[in-house]
Amino acid sequence: RKHRRSVMNRRTFIKASLTATAAVAGSVLLDGALSSASAVTVPNTTEDAKMKILVLTGSPRKNGNSNTLAEHFINGAKEAGHEVTRFDAASSKVHPCIACNKCGMNGPCMFKDDFEVVREHIIPADLVAFATPMYYFGISAQLKTVIDRFYAINGEIHIPKKAVLMMTYANNSPRNESPILTYYEVLLEYLGWKDAGRIIVPGVWPTGAINQTPFPAQAFALGKSV
């Protein structure tokens, strides 16, 4: 029975993956009408609810613009009384998934590395926040490596959670946001998570450029309001 469940989970995963690939491939053909001006939030329906939050950062630049967003988000969440853990994918040792399937989508991974920290905190987390720069129209390789390893804990995180996306990129074309936004949306749909807010920041490239914008304050407000 356990083997049969694993096979069915894998089929569901593959089906969702194919849907995501098709969606991302198609999204770059559309003219973007996506807003980059503000954070979109879903108010917390439970007054004074305190959450466990895991923030996954993916910028290899220590003082990168997406890291700045993450830091302000964390400060806002802590001020609201939430318990926050940050995992920096860029400075951690996480081996890429090699599709060996030894984990069976719900078991120990063959690689014993820093992903164990993610496993420890993401399973009980009420909200998972992703912070990444756009690299070649996708999320950073460092963050993608961590997300790929979700495969080994699929059965434990395929439960209702909230999620937040914070993304920065250098140009000013909303159309270029589409691949990452589509990826994020399909990921949440597959996992059964609910979007709690997004902060998408165009036109920032040099380190520190985001400090001259209103977006760090928006990240703080989002962290405080989730």
Regions found by a protein language model. Give the residues of each.
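N-terminal secretory signal peptides and thylakoid transit peptides that target proteins
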Residues: 6-21
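N-terminal beta1-alpha1-beta2 submodule of the flavodoxin-like/Rossmannoid cofactor-binding fold
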Residues: 17, 21-131, 137-153, 208-209, ...
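A short small-residue
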Residues: 51-54, 164-165, 199-206
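Short beta-strand elements in bilobed, periplasmic/extracellular small-molecule ligand-binding domains
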Residues: 83-87, 193-201
